[in-house]
Amino acid sequence: MSNENKTIHDFELKLICDFFSNMERQGPGSPDVTLKALSFIDNLTDKSLIADIGCGTGGQTMVLAGHVPGQITGIDLFPGFIDIFNRNARQLGLQDRVKGIVGSMDNLPFQNEELDLIWSEGAIYNIGFERGLNEWRRYLKPGGYIAVSESSWFTDERPAEINDFWMDAYSEMDTLPNQVAKLYKAGYLPVATFILPENCWTEHYFASKVAAQEIFRKKYAGNKIAEEFSSLQMIEDELYGKYKEFYGYTFFIAKKIEQ
């Protein structure tokens, strides 16, 4: 299999974790965008229960914790990410109400109608946008909120190179109108949608990825598989520079409604 045809899913979880653990965020985003999404949510008190699903090392979670009351549980499949998450919470003095646990987003450790807010930045694709919306809904209280960022097509047609790349990486990627329709279908009332600005990719994701690559390549010097993985990250960056008018990330904020 050529490197051009590989996706992140073709590599060992340990390699993926080692690479991205050196980054504050494991996908496009920024503190400003996190807070913008949060501004559309009005149901939170010091009794609120919040879950950040696919939290990574918790960059966005710590931003949330600094601006909302309540208890926050971060969930991620990678123990290495959760170790960093909990260390960051302790360093910020948030450990009494912010904790990270190892778990899978397709088997969440919550009761039905337990959560006031489900948050997930750049992670719902791991289970699929539509599946995540449907399966996670039951954990929300009536009137609870979901806030997720997800990759979106901005046009119905796009060049074959970028279309083929994303069809290999994430075939469920869809256009904005279709994604909003999926929110309705899953039992949510869309409250706000907005496209993440370019600096969420260039300054807050790609720039930190360069530093992470240097650490990663030194650690895995001579490891061909690790070198292939590192090269794939560069391909993603280059494609965004060429085709950013055709796709990006969108934040979706929605409220659970009775069906």
Residue spans for each PLM region:
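Conserved alpha-helix/loop element of class I SAM-dependent methyltransferases that forms part
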Residues: G27-D46
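Class I SAM-dependent methyltransferase SAM/SAH-binding core
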Residues: A51-I53, T57-N107
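A short acidic, Gly/Pro-enriched loop at the edge of an enzyme's catalytic core
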Residues: D106-L117
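A short SAM/SAH-binding and catalytic strip from SAM-dependent methyltransferases
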Residues: L117-E130
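A short glycine-rich, Lys/Arg-flanked "PGG" loop and its adjoining helix->strand segment in the class I
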Residues: R131-Y145
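Short, glycine-/aromatic-enriched active-site segment of Class I SAM-dependent methyltransferases
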Residues: S151-Y170
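Short alpha-helix
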Residues: E172-G187
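Conserved Class I S-adenosyl-L-methionine
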Residues: A192-Q259
